[in-house]
Regions:
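Glycine-rich, acidic loop regions that bind phosphate or pyrophosphate groups
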Residues: 1-58
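Thiamine diphosphate
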Residues: 8, 24-26, 32-34, 41-42, ...
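Generic enzyme active-site microenvironment
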Residues: 16, 94, 150-151
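Generic detector of well-ordered alpha-helical packing
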Residues: 19, 96-97, 154, 246
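Short, flexible loop/turn segments with low-complexity composition
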Residues: 52-63, 245-248
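Active-site diphosphate/adenylate-binding microenvironment
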Residues: 57-142
Length: 255
């Protein structure tokens, strides 16, 4: 049977706090404490000294190059590089353009604590209402910062009604919808599982901007990096929720 040394680096101790006896019994390494994780977390927070948080390091420099003439439609790196030039430093990123997450992290990185939100895996349609939740939470806490939702056109269809709530409350959200006219992540999974050609994964003909206007949002279609930069700046000062729709090249997800 493998021992602790096969899973943990030398000198590392692992303590698991769980309310599930089965999970505690199944732990391969370390010790398990059976109890209320929420109560334990509150007690642990009381033990953390003020000022102990380390400074977030700057992102590592990476050799990057975009084409001198922007593509048509734009590539996700071109979209993210454009947004990186005009995004306010305190802006929040809520990401559910799942196939392009790695490119977003590279070209539009976040370095401030509490400024990046994304689902770990699984469900589709999380980020559109999550951006509403972040903005409402900021308002309740008296925090004034823009929220940027990076959403794929497929993900946007699952919970589009959330933008009605955003518009009703005049939340400072800028949704940038990457319109590649397909469920890229599902196509990538189909290839991974050796089941290509799954029907129903193409999304042609969607007029997302008109749908967004129907829910009360300000909405625009853009084609170029210049259009995107101009409309994003306008959205930051619009005083309401804006949906910017950007045609992009389909990307194979990094699974």
């Amino acid at each position: 049977m493998p021992g602790d040394d096969d899973y943990l680096p030398d000198g590392t101790e692992l303590l698991q706090i769980t309310g599930n006896p089965g999970v505690a019994a199944a732990a391969r390494v370390g010790d398990s404490l059976l109890g209320d994780p929420a109560a334990a977390t509150e007690l642990l927070l009381d033990m953390v000294a003020e000022g102990s948080a380390r400074t977030v390091p700057e992102p590592m420099a990476r050799p990057r190059e975009l084409p001198q003439t922007p593509s048509s439609p734009l590539t996700p790196p071109e979209v993210y590089a454009t947004l990186s030039r005009v995004r306010p430093p305190d802006a929040v990123i809520v990401n559910e353009s799942t196939p392009t997450t790695a490119q977003q992290v590279e070209w539009l990185p976040t370095v401030r604590s509490g400024s990046f939100f994304a689902t770990a895996s699984g469900g589709i349609g999380w980020a559109t209402p999550a951006a509403v939740g972040v903005a409402l939470g900021d308002r309740d806490r008296g925090v004034d910062r823009p929220v940027v939702g990076l959403i794929g056109d497929g993900s946007f269809q699952y919970s589009v009604q959330a933008i009605w709530t955003a518009a009703r409350h005049n939340l400072p959200i800028v949704y940038v919808v990457m319109r590649n006219q397909e469920y890229s992540i599902l196509k990538s999974f189909a290839v991974l599982e050796e089941t290509p050609g799954v029907p129903g994964l193409d999304l042609p003909g969607l007029d997302i901007a008109s749908v967004a206007r129907g829910f009360g949002c300000r909405a625009v279609d853009v084609e170029t990096t210049g259009d995107l930069e101009r409309e994003f700046k306008a959205a930051l000062s619009a005083g309401t929720t804006t949906v910017i729709v950007v045609p992009t090249e389909p990307q194979k997800a990094m699974l």
